[in-house]
Amino acid sequence: MSVFVKPSAIELTRIAEANIDYGKRTNNTMIYPIVIYGSQTLRNPSENIAPDYPDLEKLVEDMFLTLGEADGVGLAAPQIGKNIRLFVVDCTPWGEDHPELADYRRAFINAEIYERSEETSLFNEGCLSLPGLHEDVRRPVSIRMRYVDEKFVEHDEEFTGLPARVIQHEYDHIEGKVFTDRLSPLRRNLLKSKLQQLAGGKYRCSYKTK
C-alpha cells in the first residue's frame, strides 16, 4: 500500500509499448519515481488542491500509470514528491475474488474522513515507500469521507472492506503518516533497524525510486 502491493503482478503492455521513461514525459504520459521512507516529503503536511490546479486530470492519469508500473493498489501524491491532498486507488487486482472491485479505480482529492467505525480489523499492509516491509495493521472496518474527484465533483460516501482499508492507508500519507506509525511501540522498536536501512538507501525493489 503508498501503496499497498498488489496480490499479483499485472502486465502493463500499454506502458511497455509506449516505452515510457521514469521521470520523463513520453507520448504525453509520465511515470514518477517513488519517494522512499526517510524523505521529509512523506512527513510534511499536504495542502488542499484548488479547482484550477494545473493539469490535474493529467496528474491523476500519470499517478495511475505510476501505480500500475509499481504493482500497487494505492498511491498518494506525497509518494511522488507532491505535498497535495490527492491519492488514487486501484482495487481491480482483487476483482477475481471480489467481483464488486473488478472496475474499482478512483481518485480522491481534498479528502476528509469524518467518521470511523468502532469495529476494527487486522490486515497485512505493505507500501511502495517502504519496500520489502509488511506488517499487520489494525484499522476501522468502515469510514465516511468527503472528497472531490478529478472533475472536482463533490462526494460524501461510506466505504467498507478493502476499499476502506486502502483509502485509510493512502489518507495517512496526505496526513504525513506511514503505516508503521500505526504499529505498537514494541513492534516499531523491533523494526527500527529495517527502517534505518530504508532511510539509508539499503533496499531493493523493481520500480524506480528517489
Regions found by a protein language model. Name each.
Residues 4-168, 173-210:
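Active-site rim/adjacent substrate-binding subdomains
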